[in-house]
């Protein structure tokens, strides 16, 4: 039997904050878990780092909707880690921006990592 990913054992609910850190710049944080950045532009919103699953991404979206009704048009994935990229589909963004190396990792490890993260955050 394969050994579980380290993050898989951490099932505790995290304290979430959503703070404005600059004009139209927001930080979504959950202690011990990856953060997401939010940039509110003139016409739309950009998310930086997507979260581990669509359910977790929806927590970001819920907070974004409290401060703007502009559409989420772009998701930027700075690098590959399952907990940062696998929630990207939840945003319905026109563009997902990521480097070729990160894209390759999604193609190579995506399903295995999805299975792990979905067990952690169903």
Where in the sequence are the language-model features?
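Short acidic, Pro/Gly- and aromatic-enriched capping/linker segments at domain boundaries
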Residues: 6-20
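Conserved beta-strand hairpin/beta-sheet module of binuclear metal-dependent hydrolase folds
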Residues: 18-63
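Phenylalanine-focused residue identity feature
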Residues: 5, 18, 28, 118-121
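Active-site HxH/HxHxD metal-binding segment of metal-dependent hydrolases
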Residues: 62-122
């Amino acid at each position: 039997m394969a050994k579980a990913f380290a993050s898989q054992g951490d099932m505790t609910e995290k304290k979430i904050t959503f703070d404005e850190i600059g004009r139209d710049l927001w930080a979504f944080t959950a202690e011990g878990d990856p953060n997401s950045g939010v940039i509110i532009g003139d016409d739309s919103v950009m998310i930086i780092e997507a979260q581990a699953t669509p359910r977790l991404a929806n927590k970001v979206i819920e907070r974004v909707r409290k401060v703007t009704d502009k559409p989420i048009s772009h998701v930027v994935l700075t690098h590959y880690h399952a907990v940062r990229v696998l929630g990207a589909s939840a945003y319905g963004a026109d563009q997902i921006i990521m480097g070729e190396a990160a894209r390759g990792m999604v193609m190579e490890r995506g399903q295995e990592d999805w299975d792990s993260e979905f067990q952690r955050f169903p």
